Amino acid sequence: MRVSLFAALLAFSLICWPARAPAVECRALDFHDKRYTVCEVDLTQEKLRLFLRDVAGNPFKGFDALKRSLAGQGEHLLFAMNAGMYHPDYSPVGLFVTGGEEISPLSTASGEGNFFLKPNGVFFVTQSGAGILETSRYAQRHQPVLLATQSGPMLLQNGEIHPRFIAASDSLRTRNGVGIVSPQRVVLAISDSPVNFYEFSLLFRDALGCKEALYLDGSISSLYSLKLERNDNLKPLGPIIGVTR
């Protein structure tokens, strides 16, 4: 039987050029007897966005309100996660930049709580890719950013775990954070069972291949994933990071 040239070329292309990986890939991951959900975002294909308030100026406080707002603009939420700590009025603690506009300034203050467990840091995205910098180092840069959120503590700096973390710590919480695989690949993770800071840092370093990672929050940690059919609605949220289509 004669095979057309087109069919032969099509078969060859399917063998030699496999389907492109999804731009947002969420999956379960078991690491050191703990379960995590990990979402990787390819910035060459998708754009990360930060959300805080709707067009009327009201804080979203969660994924459902964000979804409704986006739907009114003809957009759909693919993935989202809480993206930093906030004050009682849901305003960000520290730097918050969305759409290139600074909503809240960088904080170099000292204080109580995880945000001030220094070194803390900033996750940011520019035209050339994503990065995480310790707060004082970020303060020295002057290039524009598309988005940025400040939080703390840093989980990893140049592959080194935060010096105040204790491997055997009994401070166990649901936690979420963000790490840099490469300037064009960002990984966000949430623990599906309580973990300590040290365990969470090991996840980013040893399982996800990050050298820089930043803690986003704990206890309120929440995930929305269209692919996984997951929509956490645990507690009110402040800043939210996500991908839309």
Per-region residue spans from a language model:
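Conserved, well-ordered active-site substructure
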Residues: 93-111, 164-212, 221-245
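Short, solvent-exposed aromatic-acidic interface loops
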Residues: 53-58, 136-141, 191-194
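Bacterial N-terminal signal peptides
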Residues: 7-15
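Zymogen propeptides
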Residues: 17-114
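Positively charged n-region of N-terminal signal peptides that target proteins for export
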Residues: 1-5
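Active-site-adjacent helix-turn-beta-strand microarchitecture at beta-sheet edges
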Residues: 91-165
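Short acidic-glycine loop/turn motifs at beta-strand connectors
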Residues: 42-45, 89, 124-129, 157-158, ...
